[in-house]
């Protein structure tokens, strides 16, 4: 039986924006037409498959993962990226707190559309 907190539920986008600033922005951009940094630009993330941001050099693991990004796949990925996609080059250790993942995903839904 699934526990509450095992999947995405809408969070606070303002808190998610702060998390993005402190935990993600050094490697990612969200703006339409924004460049890639260490990690890919995240604009258009929702509905896109792993390893598909044009012009970004992904690992084979990311290209072959066959995951379509949505709220629940991101929820699982952001808990522990290297466990979700073994071989990813994303160095981020993850967000263990359910609320933080929900807040960040809510922000990403708004900022990457």
Curated annotation (Swiss-Prot):
Electron carrier protein. The oxidized form of the cytochrome c heme group can accept an electron from the heme group of the cytochrome c1 subunit of cytochrome reductase. Cytochrome c then transfers this electron to the cytochrome oxidase complex, the final protein carrier in the mitochondrial electron-transport chain. The lineage of its organism: Eukaryota, Fungi, Dikarya, Ascomycota, Pezizomycotina. One of its GO terms (molecular function) is electron transfer activity. Induction: By oxygen and heat shock. It comes from the Eukaryota. The modification N6,N6,N6-trimethyllysine is found at residue 82. Binds 1 heme c group covalently per subunit. It is found in: Mitochondrion intermembrane space. Pfam families: Cytochrom_C. One of its GO terms (cellular component) is mitochondrial intermembrane space. This is Cytochrome c. InterPro entries: Cyt_c-like_dom, Cyt_c-like_dom_sf, Cyt_c_1A/1B. Belongs to the cytochrome c family. Its main location: mitochondrion. SUPFAM superfamilies: Cytochrome c. GO terms for biological process: mitochondrial electron transport, cytochrome c to oxygen; mitochondrial electron transport, ubiquinol to cytochrome c. Keywords: Electron transport, Heme, Iron, Metal-binding, Methylation, Mitochondrion, Respiratory chain, Stress response, Transport. It comes from Emericella nidulans (strain FGSC A4 / ATCC 38163 / CBS 112.46 / NRRL 194 / M139). Heme c binds at residues 24, 27-28, 90. The keyword Heme applies.
